[in-house]
C-alpha cells in the first residue's frame, strides 16, 4: 500500500482537532516536564558557572542524572500518548488513568527497545567523540558504526508503537517490524527524516530566536504541541505501514 505523507499529515491534524481535549492534556503534561527539566538544567549550570574553563570540576554526575530523568519521563509521556491514541482509534478509550496503567505495564519493554534502537549509533558516536577528546581523527570504524546505527534506527523506530499497540513480546515485535520493513525501506526513511530530523531542526531554529521568558514559554508550548502532534503522525503512519 502506497503511503501519501501529505494525507498522513492531514489525517493526523483532523484527529488532533477532533480529540483536542485529550491532545492538549498531553501537551500540558509534556510542557510541564520540559519546563521542569529546563529549570533543573539551569540550576546545575548556575552552580558550575565558575568552572567553565575547568571541566574536571563540573558536576557531570548531576547533569547526566537530570538528562536521564528527563529522557525517561519524556519517553513515558510519548508511550502514554501513543497508547491513548491507539485506544481512541479503536474507540476503546476511557480515561488517561487507564492508559497510564497500560503504559506502565509495558514501559520496561519500551526502554529496552529505545536502547536497542540507539545503541549501535551511540557506539559509533562514542568512539568518534573519544577520538576528538584525544585530538585524533575518528576512525573509519566509528564512521561505519554510525552509518550502521542510523540504518538500524530507521529499520526499528516503529517497534515501540507496535509493542504498545499489541500484546506481542519484544522478540516478536522486533521480528515483525524488521520483516515488514524489508520491502518498505524508502517510506521508513522518509518518515524518519520527517520526525527525527526535520522537526528537531525546526524546533532548534525557533529556539535560537529566544530572548525573553515570554518567548521561551511560547516556544516551549509550541514544541510540546508539535511533539504530541508527531505522535499522532507516528501512529497514523504505523497503521498504514502495517497494512497489506
Swiss-Prot record:
Keyword terms, alphabetized: Cell membrane, Membrane, Transmembrane, Transmembrane helix
Keyword DNA repair attributed: no
Gene source species: Haemophilus influenzae (strain ATCC 51907 / DSM 11121 / KW20 / Rd)
Spans traversing the lipid bilayer: 22-42, 63-83, 110-130, 140-160, 186-206, 213-233
Membrane topology: Multi-pass membrane protein
Gene Ontology CC entries for this record: plasma membrane
Subcellular location: Cell membrane
Keyword match Cell membrane: yes
Listed name of the protein: Uncharacterized protein HI_0825
Amino acid at each position: 500500500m502506497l503511503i501519501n505523507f501529505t494525507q498522513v499529515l492531514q489525517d493526523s491534524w483532523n484527529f488532533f482537532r477532533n480529540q483536542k481535549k485529550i491532545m492538549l492534556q498531553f501537551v500540558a503534561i509534556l510542557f510541564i516536564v520540559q519546563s521542569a527539566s529546563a529549570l533543573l538544567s539551569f540550576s546545575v549550570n548556575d552552580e558550575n558557572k565558575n568552572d567553565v574553563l575547568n571541566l574536571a570540576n563540573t558536576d557531570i554526575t548531576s547533569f547526566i542524572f537530570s538528562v536521564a530523568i528527563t529522557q525517561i519521563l519524556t519517553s513515558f509521556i510519548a508511550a502514554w500518548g501513543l497508547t491513548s491514541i491507539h485506544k481512541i482509534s479503536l474507540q476503546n478509550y476511557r480515561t488517561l488513568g487507564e492508559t497510564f496503567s497500560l503504559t506502565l505495564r509495558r514501559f520496561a519493554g519500551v526502554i529496552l527497545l529505545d536502547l536497542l534502537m540507539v545503541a549501535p549509533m551511540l557506539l559509533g558516536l562514542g568512539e568518534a567523540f573519544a577520538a576528538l577528546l584525544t585530538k585524533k581523527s575518528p576512525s573509519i570504524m566509528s564512521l561505519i558504526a554510525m552509518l550502521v546505527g542510523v540504518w538500524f534506527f530507521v529499520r526499528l523506530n516503529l517497534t515501540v508503537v507496535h509493542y504498545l499497540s499489541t500484546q506481542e513480546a519484544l522478540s516478536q515485535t522486533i521480528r515483525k517490524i524488521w520483516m515488514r520493513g524489508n520491502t518498505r525501506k524508502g517510506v521508513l526513511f522518509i518518515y524518519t527524516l520527517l520526525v527525527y530530523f526535520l522537526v528537531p531542526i525546526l524546533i532548534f531554529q525557533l529556539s535560537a530566536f529566544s530572548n525573553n521568558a515570554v518567548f521561551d514559554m511560547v516556544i516551549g508550548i509550541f514544541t510540546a504541541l508539535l511533539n504530541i502532534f508527531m505522535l499522532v503522525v507516528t501512529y497514523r503512519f504505523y497503521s498504514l505501514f502495517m497494512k497489506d
